[in-house]
Every structure is written in C-alpha cells, then in structure tokens.
C-alpha cells in the first residue's frame, strides 16, 4: 500500500480529500453551509495526529473570534460596507495574535470576511452555525488524520540518513585533502556542509513527527525499537557533523604545518572513511590514530600550534565514532 500510492499521490493529499468529502457530507446532511467547515478541515490535516490536535485547539477559538467580529461589525456598520470587512479582518488578526492563536489566524480571517455577505439580520444563527461547522471540520479532519493512513516516515528517514552519511564521508575526505594542501578557508566545503546540515535537520524533524505519531498508536513495540535505532543513528550523525564542522570553520589567516607522519596518518584515515561509501565497512588504522594522538600529546596547552591540535583532535573524534559504529558490534 505504501509503495503504490506514494508514486501517484501522497497520503496527506488523500486524507485532505477524504476529510473534505466527509466534512461537506455531514454539513449538507445538517443543512449547513459547508465552506467554513471545509476550510477548517483542510488546514487541520497535519503531518501527525498530535499536530492536528494541538493546532486544532487553537484554530477553533480563533474561528470563533473571527465569526464573532463578523457578526459584531455587520451589526454596527451593516452590509455592504467596506468598514465591516476591514474591521472584521483587522480585529480578528489583533485578537488572535494577542491570545497566541496565530496558527488559526488565516482561517479565522477567511471565515470572518466570507460569512459577512450571508449574515443579514440572523446574527445569532450565523454565529452558532459557523461555530458548529468549524467544529465539524475540526473533528472530522482530526479523526481522518488519526485513523486513515497513519504517517510512517521510517523509509524516508533511513534514506535521508544514508544520504547524509555518504555526503559526510565524502566531505570529510575532501576536507582532509584541503587541509593537507594548505587550503584552510574553503567556500566549497562551507556550501557542502550547509547542504548536509539541511538534510540532517530534515531527518530530525521527520524523526520527531514519527515519535509524536507513535505516542497515539499503542502496542507498536517493533516500531518503537526501529525508531530507537533510527534516533541513535541520527544522534551519531549529528555528532559527526559537529566535529566535521569544527575542521571546516577555522579562524581566518591561519597556517597549519603537518609533519610527513601526520600527513600519512590523515590520508590513511580519510581514505578509510571515504571507502565506507563503497564497502559499507570502516577499516581502522590503529597506527595512524596513535600517530595523531602522539602529536596532540606533544603540544603544550598554550602552544602556538593549538589550532593544529584542535584539528587533529576533531579528526580523532570522527575516527573514534566511526570505529564504534562499524566495528563495535
């Protein structure tokens, strides 16, 4: 099921269509105008059931505020009147912002200005009917989002993790080459790192969505285990990216001089990291790591080569994390 519909139409689009159909059906059965309920239903479909409920709690009172101002200013200025539309929109935005209901402001304003032409003299009826239709849209969309095609981001998360890891390994290898060639300030590496961090941030967002969704679906022990493994992998990737950024973002106008032994050690480690992409295996170089450790130990606390010590230390931390990931099993 997950495979065929995603190639044609997304699950969230399907749920939006279903919520729109059911909402309009219920409203028509109750002889209510469905447009306001549909607006609420469409914006209530969120990436997770938790997000739908959380934002729904704020969208409903925001819609009530919009309907209230529409009725109030229609009563004061009448319809048609430019002042009715202006003050309805303006005060709806102001009050929603003041009450921290920004997530519902758009729907509240649309509801407010759209209902003005149909109010006439039926002030109370229109107010309560808009309240009822908004509630129908909110509840219907929330149930659809909870029951129909619960979001599963596992495959997307794992694909993102694999993509970010390969990009990270390539960037580490190329950055080591730049350092050995004396290119300490690199716009190319900066750009690649920014793109990498974008993928990592997206992965962490999707992981958060999946965690929120699982809280509403009990008895999913296998999925919790899978999510835990994904979260641990994502956490290590974040650490690796942090250490990698520390050898990319260096002070301007620095100059590092590596000994021949240090250069050979860095080359061996960077090649081993780059080979993970092909072999999915990290070949440790204990002697190279020992060489770099000795270089760090020889430097004094306030040595003029402290930046060099910092760079080598970050390389060793990346080496240690990868060694633990691929060899401590």
From Swiss-Prot:
Membrane-spanning segments: 25-45, 60-80, 87-107, 108-128, 131-151
Membrane topology: Multi-pass membrane protein
InterPro entries, per the entry: ArAE_1
Source superkingdom: Bacteria
S-S pairs: none
A Pfam family: ArAE_1
Keywords from the UniProt entry: Cell membrane, Membrane, Transmembrane, Transmembrane helix
Subcellular location: Cell membrane
Main location (coarse class): membrane
GO cellular component: plasma membrane
Similarity remark: Belongs to the UPF0421 family.
Name by which UniProt lists this protein: UPF0421 protein SH1063
Organism of origin: Staphylococcus haemolyticus (strain JCSC1435)
């Amino acid at each position: 099921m997950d495979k065929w519909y995603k190639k044609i139409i997304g699950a969230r689009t399907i749920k939006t269509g279903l919520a729109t159909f059911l909402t309009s059906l219920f409203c028509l059965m109750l002889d209510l105008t469905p447009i306001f309920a549909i607006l609420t239903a469409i914006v209530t479909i969120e990436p997770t059931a938790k997000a739908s409920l959380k934002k729904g709690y704020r969208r409903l009172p925001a819609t009530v505020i919009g309907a209230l101002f529409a009725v109030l200013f229609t009563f004061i200025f009448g319809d048609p009147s430019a002042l009715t539309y202006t003050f309805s929109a303006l005060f709806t935005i102001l009050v929603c912002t003041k009450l921290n209901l920004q997530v519902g402001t758009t729907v509240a304003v649309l509801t407010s200005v759209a209902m003005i032409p149909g109010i006439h003299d039926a002030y109370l009826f229109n107010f309560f009917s808009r309240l009822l239709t908004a509630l129908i849209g909110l509840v219907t969309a929330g149930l659809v989002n909870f029951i129909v095609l619960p979001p599963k981001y596992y495959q997307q998360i794992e694909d993102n993790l694999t993509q970010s890891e390969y990009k990270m390994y390539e960037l580490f290898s190329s950055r080591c080459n730049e350092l050995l060639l004396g290119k300490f300030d690199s716009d190319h590496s900066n750009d690649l790192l920014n793109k990498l961090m974008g993928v990592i941030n997206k992965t962490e967002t999707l992981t958060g969505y999946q965690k929120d969704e699982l809280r509403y679906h009990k008895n999913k022990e296998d999925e919790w285990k899978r999510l835990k493994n994904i979260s641990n992998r994502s956490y290590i990737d974040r650490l690796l990216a942090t250490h990698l950024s520390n050898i990319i973002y260096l002070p301007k106008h620095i100059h590092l001089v590596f000994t021949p032994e240090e250069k050979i050690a860095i080359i061996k480690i960077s090649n081993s990291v780059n080979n993970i992409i092909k072999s999915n295996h990290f070949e440790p170089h204990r002697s190279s790591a020992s060489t770099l450790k000795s270089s760090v130990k020889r430097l004094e606390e306030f040595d003029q080569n402290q930046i060099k010590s910092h760079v080598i230390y970050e390389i060793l931390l990346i080496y240690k994390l990868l060694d633990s990931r691929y060899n401590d099993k």
